[in-house]
UniProtKB/Swiss-Prot annotation:
Binds a second Mg(2+) ion via substrate during catalysis. It is an enzyme of class 4 (lyase). Gene3D superfamilies: Enolase-like C-terminal domain, Enolase-like, N-terminal domain. Pathway: Carbohydrate degradation; glycolysis; pyruvate from D-glyceraldehyde 3-phosphate: step 4/5. Belongs to the enolase family. One of its GO terms (cellular component) is phosphopyruvate hydratase complex. The active site is at E209, K359. Keywords: Cytoplasm, Glycolysis, Lyase, Magnesium, Metal-binding, Secreted. Its cofactor is Mg(2+). This is Enolase. Its EC number is 4.2.1.11.
Length: 452
């Protein structure tokens, strides 16, 4: 047994300049692991609690009382004494110890950010002690599947100060032989999109996740630019065949739901013409009307995946969406399920979705995250590994995506080092796999939840 000998947390900054927590773990046999915890802007109400310094002695340290020194203290003074001496390779024991120490359903006592930082650092320390890559430590020797990247090249919603209510417009390079070739294709689309935007007089400033954030007149206009950029790059806007590049959307509908109606508040506030001859001439939708709106988009554009198409409380909206379109399109739950096994069980029983988004900090431990992934995959769902809008140079999710053979990863656009770090890590993993066996990149086939 290799014991944990030291646990230390500190406060650092994330990609948005907000404080976050970094945890270092040391082991008796010389292992070392360090993890930085991400943070979301658009969050589900049922997520585990990210502990901030509001109304504490540290409240005035940082703008908006967003410091995390309370969580840091919880690691150094409460968690560390309890897990020092435990075996670093017994991940579930360490995680369970922290869950019991916290004693609340949503980790509000110690903070999910405190607990997750320790959980991930312990796994990294164990991998380091064994002198193996993290993805090998977590997944064993069998996983060789590289994920299809979902690149958020146009940002909206809570991730950008522009006119778009949908949060993410993504490209998925499917018709390519390797992860590197897929990333090269995405690179061409990204830069051609910038060229087309500039040519049309749009700004090319970027949002939190590195995508462009133009002030479009409609969601359709954003999708039109994506299709044009794919074609301009010499690729096929679609799902199948060589050089196919598909589109995915994260609507983040909870952010434009007022409890009764879905309202495109940002587009409405842009003082658009009521005579506009496109889908966004209507700004308010019932759940049924929004379903029909999505149907029009799916019929017109090569959209293979829609995430959080309805609000987290609108279970009937999700059920109807999945029933009508789930055979041929990926219907992803994020705010709906928040990487929580119990909520996922409900979604499975109701057939509300056919895919779950996985965010480590939504649940707060590596063990619980793996439980959610395995349950989804066992139930025939895909599990998409995801970043958060507040990120760092930490690349844990890249290793996790390969370790669990998720087949898909969401980690932003091709700008901002906090996003690029994950892609660079995946390039290294693919190279590593090819030195031992062949890394697999299967494109459209990752959607085992859809009809062929």
């Amino acid at each position: 047994m290799s014991k944990i000998t030291k646990v230390f947390a500190r406060e650092i900054l994330d990609s948005r300049g907000n404080p976050t927590i970094q945890v270092d773990v040391y082991t008796l046999a010389g292992g070392f692991g360090s993890a930085i915890v991400p943070s979301g802007a658009s969050t589900g109400s049922r997520e585990a609690l990210e502990l901030r310094d509001t109304n504490t002695k540290y409240a005035d340290n940082w703008y908006g009382q967003k410091g995390v020194m309370t969580a840091v203290d919880n690691v150094n003074n409460i968690i560390a004494p309890e897990i020092i001496g435990l075996c670093c390779k017994n991940q579930r024991l360490v995680d369970q110890k922290m869950i019991e120490l916290d004693g609340t359903p949503n980790k509000e006592k110690l903070g999910a950010n405190a607990i997750l930082g320790v959980s991930l650092a312990v796994a990294k320390a164990a991998a380091n002690e064994l002198r193996m890559p993290l993805f090998r430590y977590l997944g064993g020797t069998n996983p060789t599947l590289m994920p299809v990247p979902m690149l958020n090249v146009i940002n909206g919603g809570e991730h950008a100060s522009n006119t778009l209510d949908f949060q993410e417009f993504m490209i998925m390079p499917l018709g390519f032989r390797t992860f590197k070739e897929a990333l090269q294709a995405a690179n061409k689309v990204f830069h051609n999109l910038a060229k087309l935007l500039k040519k049309s007089g749009f700004e090319t400033q970027v949002g939190d996740e590195g995508g462009f954030a133009p002030n479009f007149n409609s969601h359709e206009q954003a999708l039109d630019f994506l299709v044009d950029a794919i074609k301009e790059s010499g690729f096929n806007p679609g799902f199948k065949g060589e050089n196919a590049v598909a589109i995915a959307i994260d609507a983040a509908a909870s952010d434009f739901y007022n409890g009764q109606k879905y309202v495109f508040k940002k587009l409405m506030a842009a003082s658009l013409s009521k005579n506009q001859a496109d889908l966004d001439e209507k700004f308010e939708f019932s759940s049924e009307e929004l379903l029909n709106y999505y149907g029009q988009l799916l019929a017109k554009y090569p959209i293979i995946s829609i995430e959080d198409g309805f609000a987290e409380s609108d279970w009937q909206g999700f059920i109807a969406f999945n029933q009508k379109y789930g055979n041929n399109h990926q219907i992803v739950g994020d705010d709906l399920t928040v990487t929580n096994v119990e909520i996922l069980k409900k979604a499975i029983n109701l057939k509300a979705i056919n895919s779950i988004l996985i965010k480590l900090n939504q649940i707060g431990t590596l063990s619980e995250t793996l439980d959610a992934i395995h349950l989804a995959q066992k139930s025939g769902m895909t599990a998409v590994i995801s970043h958060r809008s507040g990120e760092s140079e930490d690349t844990t999710i890249a290793d996790l995506a390969v370790a669990v053979s998720s087949g898909q990863i969401k980690t932003g656009s091709l700008s901002r080092t906090d996003r690029i770090a994950k892609y660079n890590r995946l390039l290294v993993i693919e190279e590593y796999l090819n030195s031992y066996a062949k890394a697999d990149y299967i494109g459209r086939e990752v959607f085992y939840n859809l009809k062929k």
